[in-house]
UniProtKB/Swiss-Prot annotation:
It catalyses: ATP + H2O + cellular proteinSide 1 = ADP + phosphate + cellular proteinSide 2. This is Protein translocase subunit SecA. Monomer and homodimer. Part of the essential Sec protein translocation apparatus which comprises SecA, SecYEG and auxiliary proteins SecDF. Other proteins may also be involved. Residues 970-1024 are annotated as: Disordered. It is an enzyme of class 7 (translocase).
Amino acid sequence: MLKIFEKIFGSKHEKDIKKIRPLVSSINELQMTMASLSNDQLRERGVTLKQRVRKTLEPLEQEKTSLSRKLDNPDINLEEAETINTRLDTLAEEYEQATAAILEELLPETFALVKESCVRLKGHTYLVMGREMIWDMVPYDVQLIGGIVLHSGKISEMATGEGKTLVSTLPVFLNALTGRGVHVVTVNDYLAQRDKEWMSPVFAFHNLSVGVILNTMRPEERREQYACDITYGTNNEFGFDYLRDNMASTPEEMVQRNFYYAIVDEVDSVLIDEARTPLIISGPVPNADNSKFQEIKPWIEQLVRAQQQLVAKYLGEAEKLIKTKPGDPEAGLALLRVKRGQPKNTRYIKMLSQQGMAKLVQGTENEYLKDNSSRMQEVDDELYFAVDEKANTIDLTDKGRDFLSKLSHQDSDIFMLPDVGSEVAIIESDALIPVADKIQKKDEVYRLFADRSERLHNISQLLKAYSLFERDDEYVVQNGQVMIVDEFTGRILPGRRYSDGLHQAIEAKENVKIEGETQTMATITIQNFFRLYKKLAGMTGTAETEASEFYEIYKLDVVVIPTNASIVRKDMDDLVYKTRREKYNAVVLKVEELQKKGQPVLVGTTSVEVSETLSRMLRARKIVHNVLNARQNDREAEIVAEAGQKNAVTIATNMAGRGTDIKLGSGVRELGGLFILGSERHESRRIDRQLRGRAGRQGDPGESVFFVSLEDELMRLFGSDRVISVMDRLGHEEGDVIEHSMITKSIERAQKKVEEQNFSIRKRLLEYDDVLNQQREVIYSRRRNGLIKDRLTSDILDLLRDYSELVIKKHHKMLDVDAIEEQLMRELSIEFKPERNTFEREGIEATAEKLYQTALAFYRRKEAAMPEEIMQQIEKYAVLSVIDLRWREHLREIDSLREGINLRAYGQKDPLLEYKQEAFRLFIDLLHDIELETLSLAFKLFPVNPDEAREMEERQRKAAVRQEKLIAQHKAAESVYTASSDEPETNQEESPQQPAIAEKKPGRNDLCPCGSGKKYKNCHGQQP
């Protein structure tokens, strides 16, 4: 029905293009009028455009500067400050609207200017990545359309070879006129450097500065590159610089400007494929135990071997039953246990290709999944552990726990989590147990739960490493390190590690050095990072299949740009075989046939392992070829350059699909162009389309086909019963192949199923991260304010006023003047004790004002007693150090909350709703802690010379040792807050003297110093 409407009324993309066509005509007419101008006159037109933008925006900028100065005045009253802040918010919106309007007005002239500049540059010789290039690019009409779409903040889908890199220069130039900086995001450093050098002539012609951010650059170099009008770089570099800027100690350490406009090249790779992996800056965990995996590894290896033997037994039983009673339910149950016990078992996978086997297993599984999987436990109970390959989870069974308890010579209970709620309830209800003993017993329950929980988590991660993660598929081992391989591109991801201890488990499995455990210091997801930009756009050859996700997550519309020349590539239906062996043999025979003909062929694979298997088979037949995978990526440019030559055979993982153009050699066009041979369907249709797109660029001929087997991952996990039924009905013999459009469509349906599942994962991740993102914005805004403002006195005094009221309110009901005196001495080091009768008579407001004035007088005396520069340092240090420390702790608490929140679903609660409520409560606690500790530090910090600092640290160390030996009374805890500074030593010759911390409270998650055994936040840390 939809197709009928599209034929009558036209598709969405046709309507989008139709609207833009008149603008393209205007651009071309303007460009023709510029042809008579000299180069200097053309440059002058560019200067004029910039001046018009400046003239439009200058009044708004001047008003903003004036209002900001007023806001910095320490004598400004609250009402006036609120009025100014409201106007600043409105002004920001007006500024963006004015910017959009003037750029829209200047678009035709600017695009015409860029096009004419490209004409002038024709024949210009320059270097790109050390190779001599001659400029021969002038935008076609379809490229102008692509540029207009990008400027509009949308995604341009442009076929391979249509010149996306040149297209980007048009909106980049236009938006660079604002002087706010434009970011062009690529997928790797090589492409960032190449594109910057490749496109720089058109920008240099008009004196626009161009920079590039590379992984090896130092902060000062990065700052210079970000100051340019246009900056190229990768999403990781831009994202990590954002996180590092929000950890900076001084404004001079920050490298980025504001986030105005970004164009993301290969936008589907960056915003979708990378979206499941958050950017994380982590630091080492103090006193972390890295031997925990080594201790349990021998047990797990024996457990895995026992499971393999058990699986082999079930396979044998199934084979016997099938010979005598085909379709026997007992055979189906045995095979289902094999699937749940060792899903990647090669014998099992081969068996599935036999007639009726896949259907038998699927039918049995459906039977046991009925009634909310209530009977699946009957299947799993006979195994040592159960593997759910789709969900990527592993559960230890009672049989597995018994096995481990015998190996470890310990009770099997140590591999089970205690019921904390029941245990605590029993302790609480026992009237015979003294209060102090109750606290101790409850702490023992919590400690037992934590120990067992960690042990079970480590066991689960090791089992995953042995059962679900295969070397040369999900990862490779290079130079004694486990390196993750990108599932979408086949590239190695240096520096990236699996989370939750999984990477350490794989390191233990592979007998390489287990790297230290880390803790998160700063994190952001790709989705939320790119939402920081005022305007975002993207370009790729494959976005249409993910259009709904782009719009739902990023509010980005996808516009398919027509090709300059019609695509004549011939895309054939999939060829389906029963087994991988048959498929590989067919691939080799096809490659041999094509090479004899002279037609170049690119064989696409989904993993390093498959690429090397095919390479061995080709070598055995003496077929000369190149291999491009995660192990040979250093020759990428050279291999890709040769891939379109006559007789060329290239085997490549998906890494050959991004940022590369394969140009045809002499005589290849007549042979049919480049032949794309996919050795397996990827789980994403986009990746398959990207592979096909290597052929047929700019109207070149080409062919593409996929060879598929029922043993492939996609078919095994998500292949439709329909494909299996057709194969069974036709009764295909070994080596036979099916080629039919129905099969191809069924495979695409399976891919769609996986894409939907992955989308739901990414969407769920974003829903969770949105909670943290709102908190991150508040914290980073406060931190940036503390970093950039010269004086923070007014902020400190605002905190003091709120604090004064809180303290007085807390103790007014009981008229506890002694508690007020003790709290103020402890937290602010000031003396204040109201008379009891006066306190009762004057009430909260008047007493709070007295306290505020007393504390203010103390603070003013402190200010007068030291140089202004030192006081500024103290205030900044108080604000920044507390925010950094507490934010790190908060991230750790949020991580812990996320790990266990899904278990709430068993209690008929929505985990996301529970997470939002818990995270909000934690955040309120965090803000309270930050405000109190910032105020406390600002009052109690004094500069000391090095000798005094050493003497003070020694006193504190001795005091801490004494404290450990004491069993302090519960009430006396608040007098023992002594600890040395966590800050590194500073070179006093190179930087101003740093304030030393005279006192520091325990962390919220540390044990309370009172000896109660509770966490500090649940004990004496509850006080304001």
